[in-house]
Amino acid sequence: MDKQIIKLENIHKAYGDEEVLKGISLEIMEGEVVVLVGPSGTGKSTLLRCVNQLTIPDQGRVWVNGMELTDPSVDINLARQHIGMVFQDFNLFNHLTSIGNVMLGLTKVLGLKADAAYERAMKEMVRVGLQEKCDSYPGQLSGGQKQRVAIARSLAMDPILMLFDEPTSALDPELIGEVLAVMKDLALAGMTMLCVTHEIGFAREVSNRIVFMEGGVIVEEGTPKQMLQNPKLERTKQFLGKISEFH
């Protein structure tokens, strides 16, 4: 883990009078899995969206794989091709089949011919265990299956980094495991991942680092063992203890 994939330096973001991010700095190395936790409204999702510039910070700088994305001269669309993002509400096109959704970026963004795009998309559908659902439309899939299609769509673009914004929060409890299993497989394969999630079991088992945010700042960060068994701050212990009861 000696190659830096994400570097955030003094990130600030406000919406009107509300300062959501108050000078966040964070570095993530290649192959690292980092889980962001914290109360609602703490700025976790905003920070995640600053990484690929879906949200533009008011102040601060963002680097991904050595490229400064906050540099106005950077081709942000080109940079985003290498950053996968999975949202809590799937963001699939309902008029396309599962494999059509996975192929879309390959044909429209990368310019692959249909045969090559289909082959690459099918490989990722197999990877997430949905090869039997290639011709199904999103309306015919469970929430867990939709999220796995969304993950396959990101993976098909061969990203160097995956961002997950509460990928299981919209799912029925019995469907959460199938999505977490895919995420675990990605982590074991060495994918660099930044995840906003309260799935503490996943964080304990898979992550290298847990980052606790509150009030727009990083309160504490450390290994899962340190954060879950022996955090330095009472507030960290209180919050992680509470969400551990439910996850």
Language-model features, listed with the residues they occupy:
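C-terminal boundary and immediately downstream tail of ABC-type ATPase nucleotide-binding domains
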Residues: 221, 225-247
